[in-house]
Amino acid sequence: MTVAETIYLGITSTGILGLFLIYLGYPLMVLLLPKRNRPSTGQPTPTAATLIIPAWREGKGLDQKLENTLALNTSEIEVQVIVITDQSKPSELPAHIQWITETERLGKAASLNRAMQQVNTPIVIFSDANTHLNPAAILQILRSFTDPSIGAVAGEKGLMTDRDSGVRSERIYWNYESALKKLDARFNSVVGGAGELLAIRSDYFVPLPPDSLLDDLVISWEIVKQGHRIAYAPDARALETPSRNLREEATRKIRIAAGGYQFLDRHPLYAIFAISPSYAFQFLFRKWARWRLAPVLMILALIGNTGLLYVAPTSHVTEFITSAQVAFYALAALGFILEAGRVKLGWLAAPFYFVFMHVCQLRGWLRYRFGNQSVLWERTTRS
């Protein structure tokens, strides 16, 4: 093997093995490592909570959210609801629902800061207006707070299964994420809850920088920063419909990626490690490596493979790696065609969504670097 062949093989192997470590190696590690999480039940279940629903240009979607909220099983607890929105207050509204109308659009983070000023319960629950909670969601969330070490609880995010439209491959990603959250919580702590359903102890809330793009990740980090863990409540479910089409899903992915790069710039990995080494280990694989390394590793694997084709085109190693990469990207391309044609993908959803996700991450990085991602995100239309 020549020096050039060795170099290009090393580049290719770094890319492929790095991706394997990020997406499959980490779950295996946290599965095999001893649990740091030692749950206790030293406190009674909270009996009062506030549900905050931020909404902008939701229209009928907000009406449906209110119907869903009123149908929740809250007979055992006192639940206050704060709706902060641009829409006018309905003429008839239950007494436990507080309506805050915003005339100026300042972004979600600013809206949450304003709503938090009205909270007087020990627990606050954030839930996006485009999601529906299962009837027992709030009860399941509150039960996790019997452990005094828990500062926040992340619910389960899922997609409604009774719809035939939307980006079908989105579901396979959230199934993977749900499995990882279970492992994260078992090992130590969930690494960032989703804004669809996230609860915290009200006293631990730290006002958000108004220009925050990923408010849920910032809220989660502030909880960990104060020495608390984030639990996972898989039976508290927030369901939303899939994105209407690939363009809408790409818009959502790109803005999330832009927010991720903003968070990484403001919270360097070494600073996270100094506060919580165990959380930093999780954050390294769950967020940092995905955003900073994964797209680059995919490019490295392609560059190295191209070099191998140039210096050693007849090598069995080159033939094997090239065949594997060509097959993978061909399946991803086929998945794209089928997804665009709204044809059921089956297992083809995995290679397609993997490539699609990392392309969106690169676009999100470009948008953030060039300052083109506004805090005033446009609402994406769900199916």
Residue ranges and their predicted role:
Residues 80, 93-118, 164-169, 174, ...:
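Conserved donor nucleotide-binding strand/loop of the catalytic core
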Residues 129-144:
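Acidic donor-binding/catalytic loop of UDP-sugar-dependent glycosyltransferases
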Residues 47-50, 80, 218:
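Cell-envelope/extracellular polymer assembly enzymes that use nucleotide-activated donors
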Residues 145-176, 211-212, 220-285, 353-367:
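Catalytic donor/gating beta->alpha subdomain of glycosyltransferases that bind UDP-sugars
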Residues 4-5, 21, 43-44, 240, ...:
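Membrane-embedded multi-pass helical conduit in multi-pass membrane proteins
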Residues 124:
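Short aromatic/hydrophobic "clamp" motif used to bind/position activated sugar donors
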Residues 67-78:
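Short, acidic, metal-binding catalytic loop of nucleotide-sugar glycosyltransferases
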Residues 1-43:
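N-terminal membrane-anchoring/stem segments of glycan-assembly enzymes
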